[in-house]
Amino acid sequence: MVDVRKIRLILELRESGIVNPQVLSAIEKIPRENFVPKAFRNQSYENIALPIAEEQTISQPIVVALMTEALEIEKSNKVLEIGTGSGYQTSILSILSRRVYTIERIKSLLVTAENNFKKLKLTNIVTKHGDGNL
């Protein structure tokens, strides 16, 4: 089934200057609605940040796209992400790279993210609970 909202978002990202086809394809493949609470799923393809849990937010899609495009990721790359959140950005990075290492300080968010990765069968993500302190 074609999701008109997702198509509209991809077009909006293109109009905003996102040109990397791999980035746009990764965003199209990852269902953003899986990464937000049920109460906000109807807004999941609007270009806005949304609350997730623990007073945290999922980034606005244009921010995710700009950051991802700026990385110039290649499939052979390994990526370190600080702040997993619900796992949306992590999932996009996993499509574009060989492996993603991600750390999250809030355990409940990490558990949610790990469940999201399992649902999407994303197996190249290594998670860690912690604040990054050595």
Question: In which residue ranges do the predicted regions lie?
Answer:
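Conserved alpha-helix/loop element of class I SAM-dependent methyltransferases that forms part
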Residues: 8-11, 15, 47, 58-77
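N-terminal auxiliary segments of SAM/dcSAM-dependent transferases
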Residues: 1-39
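Conserved nucleotide-cofactor-binding alpha/beta core module
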Residues: 72-134
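Cytosolic histidine kinase catalytic core of two-component systems
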Residues: 21-22, 62, 108
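Short, surface-exposed glycine/acidic/tryptophan-bearing loops
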Residues: 39-52
